[in-house]
């Protein structure tokens, strides 16, 4: 099927993390800052912009603490079936066991019997990391390679 479904209004933003960072807590933000390599000044600037944006929009984003495979069904159960859902991950899938990635794909297939799901994944196990769009519709998955990305987000090369 066509990947073109028009542009929809964003009705909710959700995040899942084993240990979500509270951007209102400077100690937690300092921990994030410590992860940026000292010679990567541009990445420090991007992080500061991201923290500022997260603070500005803190009430618009619902963060869940836990395992992705445990939390996603709960989030989906609260959504209206006429909603299109976009699941986005960036450089996470390479840290998840193969069987959990397959479980996620099967879960999204099953959930797509009630709701259209778009999964944009950056990273994974390819080198260079792929940017991939998977559309889940009526229990089936359709996948398309969009491009490649640097592991630190310094560049993207589109193939579409």
Show which residues each predicted segment covers.
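SAM/dcSAM-binding transferase cores
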Residues: 137-160
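Short coil/turn segments at beta-strand junctions that form active-site/ligand-binding loops
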Residues: 59-60, 82-85, 115
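Class I S-adenosyl-L-methionine-dependent methyltransferase module
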Residues: 1-65, 78-80
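A short acidic, Gly/Pro-enriched loop at the edge of an enzyme's catalytic core
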Residues: 73-86
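Conserved SAM/SAH-binding loop
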Residues: 66-71
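A short SAM/SAH-binding and catalytic strip from SAM-dependent methyltransferases
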Residues: 85-98
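C-terminal substrate-binding/active-site "lid" region of AdoMet-derived donor-dependent transferases
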Residues: 96-145
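C-terminal His-loop and adjacent cap/lid subdomain of alpha/beta-hydrolase
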Residues: 7-9, 59-61, 65, 95, ...
């Amino acid at each position: 099927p066509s990947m073109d479904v028009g542009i929809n209004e964003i009705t909710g933003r959700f995040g899942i993390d084993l240990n979500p960072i509270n951007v209102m807590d400077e100690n937690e933000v300092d921990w994030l800052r410590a992860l940026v390599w000292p010679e990567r000044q541009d990445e420090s600037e991007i992080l500061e912009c991201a923290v500022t944006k997260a603070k500005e929009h803190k009430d618009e984003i619902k963060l869940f603490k836990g395992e992705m495979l445990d939390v996603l069904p709960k989030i989906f159960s609260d959504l209206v079936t006429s909603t299109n859902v976009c699941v986005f991950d960036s450089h996470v899938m390479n840290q998840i066991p193969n069987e959990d990635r397959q479980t996620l794909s099967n879960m999204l297939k099953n959930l797509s019997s009630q709701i259209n799901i778009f999964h944009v994944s950056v990273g994974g196990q390819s080198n260079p990391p792929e940017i991939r769009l998977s559309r889940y519709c009526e229990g089936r998955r359709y996948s398309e390679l969009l491009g490649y990305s640097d592991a630190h987000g310094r560049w993207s090369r589109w193939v579409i």
